[in-house]
Structures are given as structure tokens and as C-alpha cells.
Amino acid sequence: MFKHVTVLLKETVDGLDIKPDGTYVDCTLGGGGHSSYLLSQLTEGGKLIAFDQDEIAIQNAKEKFSSYGEQFITVKSNFRYLAEKLQEIGITEVDGILFDLGVSSPQLDTPERGFSYHHDAPLDMRMDQDAPLTAYDVVNSWSYEQLVRIFFQYGEEKFSKQIARKIEAYRENKAIETTGELVELIKEGIPAPARRTGGHPAKRVFQAIRIAVNDELKVFEEALESAIEMVKPGGRVSVITFHSLEDRICKTTFKRNSTTPQLPPGLPIIPDEFKPKLKLITRKPILPSDIELEENNRARSAKLRIAEKR
């Protein structure tokens, strides 16, 4: 069963200011939590298009929401192809788009997907099971320098060099095949006092490898720009991020698109190309409530930002 506790459910969907007959996009279908709440607010004229790379998520949602008929459309695709895929089904503009950038719990909890450092499994970490690059390829084929870079940039891991050295030395004799082997090497690369603080010692490196395998930051940056272009004036974009790298991209993109650039003084009117595209709905991110944090530990790092097209 595809079970997943949706984070910031009401805040994210309500933040889109739903029009009952509007057209909306859920870029991250997952377990269908946001989609379910959004669909419940649409009338017969409304429509929801939901993206996911995961075939299991798509099939589950088709069954779950079959009663909505043509109001609910699934697209099995990475959301980096948002504009193209919508155009393929005749949609050129929408009333709202949401992103929930957390890895869905079923992916984390299915050991053979290789996302979790709590289960021993083959090194995979692909969101899209048809994609060519796996965690095995990254860990066994990428150079010491490349590993240091991703561990530091994507995982903000202080002991990136030490961990990369352990990986480099180990794979000279044998390929690193499982998450369990990788966890042990990470632990060896982190000094004992540091291992005892800040959560699981493998957390940051696993995050870094997952981001690299799925090219997550570049994909999100491109998709967010596409979303801003595709939303109608008055429409909104809601984004839930789970770590500082994603949040920085969202914050920077929203700020850049909601700010008027420096113009020469004395211009009678501001040319259209210099007018801000967005109005910020959230100056500061919305965080989960204490009640939600008690019920769902995975919500603790979630941040929600919302912007409206001018």
C-alpha cells in the first residue's frame, strides 16, 4: 500500500487560492495527499494534472481518483518537462502549481529502492526507475574530487574529504554494492565525537548522492522558472522544500521575479519587461505547526513559500 503522510497539506493547497473551475498542476503526486485535497475543492469544470516519475505512484493515484474521470490527468514524467508535457495535452496556462520536494515515504521505506540508510539494499536511489544513472555508478565510478564536491555542496558534509578517501580506498579492492557497505564507510570517515551528534552519520552523504543521481537542484530550478511562466496572472505557485539548498533556489527565484530592477530615474512608465512577474504571498516561509511535527517527524525541516503571478 502506498502510504505517505502529506506535509503542510492545508497550508499548501489553500495557499493556491483555489478557483473551483480552475486548472491546477501537482508536480509531485507521490501518495496523492495534496492532489486529494485539491480535487475535493474543484467543481466539474476544474481539472488537476499530476506529475510523477514513479510508476507505482501513478497507478495508485489512477485507482484512488478514478471517480474524478477526466478531471484528473496523470503524467509519468520528471517535472523538468512541465511546459512540454502540458502543451502535449493542449494546456498552455494554468491557475496554480504546487511542488512538494520531499522524497515520498514509500520510496524511503521500500528497501530495494536504496534511498534509506536504515535498510541494507542495492545502491540505486533513482526516482525514475528507467533513468540510467544510479547511486552505484556515482559511488564506484566518480572521482575522489567529484565525490568531495557533491558531498560538500549537496550534503553540506564537513567530513567530505575523509569520507571520499574511505570510498576511494575501499573500491580499489571491491565494488561498493549496498547501502549497508556505504554506511559503514561513511562512519569510518567521520570522527567518533562527530558521529554521536546531529542525527544519523550517513544522512548528509545519502542526501548528496540522491540529489546527484536525480539532478534534483538543476531540475527544480528549471521547473520553477517554467511554472512561473505557465501560471496565469492571479495564479499561484506553492513550493515545499526540505533542505537549505532547495529553499535557497526557491527564495532567490521568487525574489528575483518579484523585484523591479534598478532603472534610470525619470522614466514616465516602467516598460513591461522590467515589471515584476510575481508578488510574494509569504515574506517568510510557513513552517509546520507543533501538532503536525508531533504527528509526523519527517515534517521538521519543511518550509512552504508561495508567490502569485502579477
UniProtKB/Swiss-Prot annotation:
It is found in: Cytoplasm. Pfam families: Methyltransf_5. Keywords: Cytoplasm, Methyltransferase, rRNA processing, S-adenosyl-L-methionine, Transferase. It is an enzyme of class 2 (transferase). One of its GO terms (molecular function) is rRNA (cytosine-N4-)-methyltransferase activity. It comes from the Bacteria. SUPFAM superfamilies: Putative methyltransferase TM0872, insert domain, S-adenosyl-L-methionine-dependent methyltransferases. Its main location: cytoplasm. GO terms for biological process: rRNA base methylation. Belongs to the methyltransferase superfamily. RsmH family. This is Ribosomal RNA small subunit methyltransferase H. It comes from Bacillus cereus (strain ATCC 14579 / DSM 31 / CCUG 7414 / JCM 2152 / NBRC 15305 / NCIMB 9373 / NCTC 2599 / NRRL B-3711). The lineage of its organism: Bacteria, Bacillati, Bacillota, Bacilli, Bacillales.
